[in-house]
Amino acid sequence: MSLPAAAPQPSAAPPIIVRRLGLVPYVPAWARMREFTAARGADTPDELWLLEHPPVYTAGIAGKPEHWPRVDNGIPVLRVDRGGQITYHGPGQLVAYLLLDMRRRGIGVRPLVRQMEQAVINLLADYGVAAEGHTDAPGVLSLIHI
């Protein structure tokens, strides 16, 4: 008596390598991400980089000069090749960069952003911090009085 063949199982997504990089200036981190992406092969594992930056504003593709900081506070503003407008990065702010092969994982940019936002909202809720996302502006907002 032979057993029926097992049904094919969906392949699990490959693991993601997590790198905790500490305080890294924005420009070298950005350059390294571009190098990583350019050198990526079909079997290159995806990575998650966790780091902080010294104070810097980044202006994405939609960043208009009228949205830039209005005072010269000594913090540089850098034009970068990402979506969005102006973002501040600084010490004490955890930045997570996902270096994913999105085709291999079968996900688009907008669904990925929504899933990441929800993951952050859920994590903060676990610590009793109320947070929310907005459909008109990517990101997670939490107003905390320290």
Please describe what each predicted stretch is:
Residues M1-L141:
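N-terminal lobe of the biotin/lipoate ligase/transferase fold
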Residues I144-I146:
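Conserved small/polar residues in nucleotide/adenosyl-binding loops
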